[in-house]
C-alpha cells in the first residue's frame, strides 16, 4: 500500500459540523482533496459556506443546520443519508468558546453560558454521533472524530464551561470507542491548543505574547495543523486508532 492509497477517501461520505470557517473549513478542503464527498454543515453565514464549497467544487455540498437543536441535527443526518446513502465519517467540530469567568456577577448569564456551551459542544456532538451510528451500522462501520481541546485536560479559569464541555467530549469519544467497536465503528479525538481561527481571535489579540510563551514551538497553530491530523484519522492509516486523543498544541500541554 503506497502513501497515496493510505490517505485515499474516494467514495466516502464525510459530514463536518461547523465547516464554514476555521478548522472545519480546512478539514473539508483536505477531505475533498483526498477524494471524499464532503457535507459542509454550517449555521451562520451562507456566503462563508458557499465560499468553502466553491473552493472544493463538486465534491462538496453545504447543508445548513443548527446542530445544537436536536431536531435540526436529526434532519441534517436524515437528509445526508437520504441523499448519499450513508455517513462514513462524522467530524464533530462545531463549538462555542465564550468568556464566562468565575468572578462574574450575573448568575443568569453564568447559567446561560453553561447551557449554550454544553448544548453545542456536547449534546450536539452526542446527538450527531448517535444518529450517524445508525447509518454506519447498516453500512458495516464508520468513524467518528471529535474536536476537543487542550482545555479538556488543562482547565480554563475564564472559560470553565468550555473546558468542562471538551472534557465531556473526550469521555464521549472513549465511550463510543468501547461500545461501538463491535459494529466496526471507531472514535478518536483531537485536542488542539490555541489555533489561528476566528473563534480564538479575541483571546489571541488580547494575550498573544503570553500564549506563545507557553508553547515550546513558539507559534500559534494553524488550521492545517489540525486538519491534517483529522484527515489521518479518517483515512485507512487511522483504522486501528480507537478511543484516543491526539494533542495538537505545540507542546504547551502534555496529558
Please give the residue ranges for each predicted region:
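Conserved mid-core segment of classical short-chain dehydrogenase/reductases
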Residues: 74, 96-115, 138, 158-161, ...
Amino acid at each position: 500500500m503506497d502513501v497515496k492509497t493510505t490517505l485515499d477517501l474516494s467514495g466516502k461520505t464525510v459530514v463536518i459540523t461547523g465547516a464554514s470557517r476555521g478548522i472545519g473549513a480546512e478539514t473539508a478542503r483536505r477531505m475533498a482533496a483526498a477524494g471524499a464527498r464532503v457535507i459542509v454543515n454550517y449555521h451562520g453565514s451562507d456566503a462563508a459556506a458557499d465560499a468553502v464549497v466553491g473552493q472544493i467544487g463538486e465534491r462538496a455540498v453545504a447543508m445548513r443546520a443548527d446542530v445544537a437543536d436536536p431536531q435540526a441535527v436529526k434532519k441534517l443526518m436524515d437528509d445526508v443519508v437520504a441523499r448519499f446513502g450513508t455517513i462514513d465519517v462524522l467530524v464533530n467540530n462545531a463549538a462555542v468558546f465564550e468568556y464566562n469567568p468565575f468572578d462574574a456577577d450575573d448568575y443568569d448569564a453564568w447559567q446561560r453560558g453553561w447551557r449554550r456551551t454544553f448544548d453545542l459542544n456536547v449534546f450536539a456532538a452526542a446527538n450527531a454521533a448517535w444518529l450517524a451510528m445508525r447509518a454506519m451500522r447498516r453500512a458495516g462501520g464508520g468513524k467518528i472524530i471529535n474536536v476537543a481541546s487542550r482545555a479538556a485536560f488543562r482547565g480554563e479559569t475564564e472559560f470553565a464551561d468550555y473546558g468542562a464541555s471538551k472534557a465531556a467530549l473526550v469521555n464521549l469519544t472513549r465511550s463510543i470507542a468501547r461500545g461501538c467497536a463491535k459494529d466496526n465503528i471507531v472514535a478518536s479525538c483531537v485536542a488542539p491548543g490555541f489555533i489561528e481561527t476566528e473563534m480564538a481571535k479575541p483571546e489571541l489579540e488580547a494575550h498573544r505574547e503570553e500564549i506563545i510563551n507557553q508553547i515550546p514551538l513558539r507559534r500559534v497553530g494553524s488550521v492545517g495543523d489540525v486538519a491534517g491530523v483529522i484527515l489521518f484519522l479518517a483515512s485507512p492509516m487511522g483504522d486501528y486508532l480507537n478511543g484516543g486523543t491526539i494533542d495538537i498544541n505545540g507542546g504547551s500541554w502534555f496529558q
